[in-house]
């Protein structure tokens, strides 16, 4: 079979204006970024139509290090639904350069279920990540200048919370010292870099309702504390207007096309392990405005992405999914059954049977939110019929709909079985009104306990001294009603990435809590998770090149 980029290049794209027209988007409200990409003015969102659309979340069991194909299934399902006559748009996150050149590769789908042009989407796209990175680091520069200019007059800060960001994986930048050298180089202080998808600016962009809300949230970003323990925000710095200007164009959702020329929105890109893991509210609502069915995905496993989708995104956006699709692979189930990563492609029915406990736990958790769930088996060429049949039978015994997805090899035709199951399930048994994992009024400790104990399976919650201090600050500053966003490993229900399966009765250690007052959420850092990833021993960058003007190795 051809590589992803070979398939992408073999498809003759249609002009984005044609995609817009066929979708019902007025072309006078799009701004072209070349022939095949456009931004759509957020004024085109119609809240009445949003409430009429069928929103479907695609999530997954705990993934392998190579991922699980959730984006491919999301795109494939959209193709399949369009194939059976249901007007459908997929709304996805933008890829980050970090994993694109690091371990996972790109995030534009795969095979014959991709969003196009995949090379541009995976690389610089419309410059949204550049704008977010620039806006974040502009705040850093302006804050450092404020500290320098006020170094002798008592108006400086006792504590600086704001770090920098960069859209690459670079472990050496996690902790740095700035302002070294002569005094004219600024105040010497400890700092560090997070990856751009973990930026609070990214979260704000994805949660903002409009430009006015964007500015309000930027004003509220907490930068540090004064010497008399008062919070110091971007509003105090006086630069909210300038930062909003940098993000003005980035706020508009990006319109592209699938491998079968149907519309797709790709906008925003927070990771689900270190951020809230969902594309922008504006892009999702735009898709819902112009479609009868909207497919969206949330990053990594359901313990991370789906929980945050329900408890943060849906809560803020006022939307409820009619159905959740849980993506499963035989490879991941075998890993959870004790097979090492290098042997998960080999048939092993006994290991798969053991690993099904991970799927069952995710199913139980999704039902905790009142969701009707169907299982999409994302098929690989090395899956045996016995493995597929076992999972199908297991799901049938549990009363869960099951369909095989072959969109990677067959495009929309390979997702018709899944599409028909989705439509039938929504018509006969749609999800109940969303039941959140916690209430806004719950204390922060209660919120953490409800997610960690009820969903992850923890038996005890412990806090570092730094986290305990933050809990006190949160109450004093009036941030206690914010939802929580737990940052932890994506490879386990626990905080230990080496413990697979359906682990229970473990200690859940809260290392720190980051107060994202602009995004209006509390990032709870658990275990040893890093908000700036490192590169693997053999990064994807080693396989990417340009030959005769054509990009090779991008996936």
UniProtKB/Swiss-Prot annotation:
Pfam families for this protein: FTHFS (PF01268)
Reactions mediated catalytically: (6S)-5,6,7,8-tetrahydrofolate + formate + ATP = (6R)-10-formyltetrahydrofolate + ADP + phosphate
Biological or metabolic pathway of the protein: One-carbon metabolism; tetrahydrofolate interconversion
Organism superkingdom: Bacteria
Residues noted as binding ATP in the record, renumbered to the chain: 64-71
EC numbers for this chain: 6.3.4.3
Keywords attached to this entry: ATP-binding, Ligase, Nucleotide-binding, One-carbon metabolism
Keyword ATP-binding listed: yes
EC primary class: ligase
InterPro entries to which the protein is assigned, alphabetical: Formate_THF_ligase, Formate_THF_ligase_CS, P-loop_NTPase
PROSITE patterns reported for this sequence: FTHFS_1 (PS00721), FTHFS_2 (PS00722)
GO annotation terms (biological process): tetrahydrofolate interconversion
Gene Ontology MF: a single term: formate-tetrahydrofolate ligase activity
UniProt KW Ligase keyword: yes
Matching NCBIfam families: PRK13505.1
HAMAP family recorded: FTHFS
Family designation: Belongs to the formate--tetrahydrofolate ligase family.
Name of the protein in its database record: Formate--tetrahydrofolate ligase
Organism: Phocaeicola vulgatus (strain ATCC 8482 / DSM 1447 / JCM 5826 / CCUG 4940 / NBRC 14291 / NCTC 11154)
Classification of source organism: Bacteria, Pseudomonadati, Bacteroidota, Bacteroidia, Bacteroidales
């Amino acid at each position: 079979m051809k590589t992803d980029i070979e398939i992408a290049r073999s498809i003759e794209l249609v002009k984005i204006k044609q995609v817009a027209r066929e979708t019902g988007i007025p072309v006078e409200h799009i701004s072209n970024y070349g022939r095949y990409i456009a931004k759509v003015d957020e004024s085109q969102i119609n809240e009445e139509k949003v409430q009429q659309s069928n929103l479907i979340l695609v999530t997954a069991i705990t993934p392998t290090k190579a991922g699980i194909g959730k984006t491919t299934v999301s795109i494939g399902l959209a193709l399949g639904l369009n194939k059976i006559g249901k007007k459908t748009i997929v709304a996805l996150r933008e890829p980050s350069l970090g994993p694109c050149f690091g371990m996972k590769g790109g995030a534009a789908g795969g095979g014959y279920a991709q969003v196009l042009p995949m090379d541009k989407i995976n690389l610089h796209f419309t410059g949204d990540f550049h704008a977010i990175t620039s806006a974040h680091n502009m705040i850093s520069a302006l804050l450092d200048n404020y500290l320098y200019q006020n170094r002798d007059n008592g108006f400086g800060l006792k504590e600086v919370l704001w770090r920098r960001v960069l859209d690459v994986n670079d472990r050496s930048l996690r902790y740095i010292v700035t302002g070294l050298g002569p005094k004219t180089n600024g105040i010497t202080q400890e700092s560090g870099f997070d990856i751009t998808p973990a930026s609070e600016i990214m979260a704000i962009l994805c949660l903002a309702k409009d430009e006015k809300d964007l500015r309000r949230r930027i004003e509220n970003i907490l930068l540090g504390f004064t010497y008399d323990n008062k919070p110091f925000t971007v509003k105090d710095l006086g630069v909210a207007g300038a930062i909003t200007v940098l993000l003005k164009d980035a706020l508009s959702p990006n319109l592209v096309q699938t491998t079968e020329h149907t519309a797709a929105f790709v906008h925003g890109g927070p990771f689900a392990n270190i951020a809230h893991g969902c594309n922008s509210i504006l892009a999702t609502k735009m898709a819902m405005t112009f479609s009868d069915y909207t497919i969206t995905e949330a990053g990594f496993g359901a313990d991370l992405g789906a929980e945050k989708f329900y408890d943060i995104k849906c809560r803020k956006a006022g939307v409820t999914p009619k159905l959740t699709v849980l993506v499963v692979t035989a490879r991941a189930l075998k890993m959870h059954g004790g097979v090492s990563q290098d042997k998960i492609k080999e048939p092993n029915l006994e290991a798969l049977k053991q690993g099904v406990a991970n799927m069952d736990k995710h199913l139980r958790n999704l039902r905790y939110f009142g969701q009707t769930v169907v299982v999409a088996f994302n098929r690989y060429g090395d899956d045996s019929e016995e493995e597929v049949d076992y999972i199908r039978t297991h799901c049938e015994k549990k009363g869960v709909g099951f369909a095989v997805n072959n969109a990677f090899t067959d495009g929309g035709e390979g997702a018709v079985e899944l599409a028909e199951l989705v439509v039938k399930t929504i018509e006969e048994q749609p999800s109940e009104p969303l039941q959140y994992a916690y209430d806004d009024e719950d204390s922060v400790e209660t919120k953490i306990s409800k997610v960690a104990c009820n969903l992850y399976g923890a038996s005890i919650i412990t806090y570092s001294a730094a986290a305990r201090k933050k809990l006190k600050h949160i109450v004093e500053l009036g941030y206690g009603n914010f939802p929580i966003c737990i940052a932890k490993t994506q490879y386990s229900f626990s905080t230990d990435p080496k413990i697979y399966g359906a682990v229970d009765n473990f200690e859940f250690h809260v290392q720190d809590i980051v107060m994202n007052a602009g995004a209006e959420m509390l990032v709870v850092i658990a275990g040893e998770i890093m908000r700036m990833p490192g590169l693997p021993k053999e990064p994807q960058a080693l396989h990417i090149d340009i030959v005769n003007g054509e990009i090779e190795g991008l996936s």
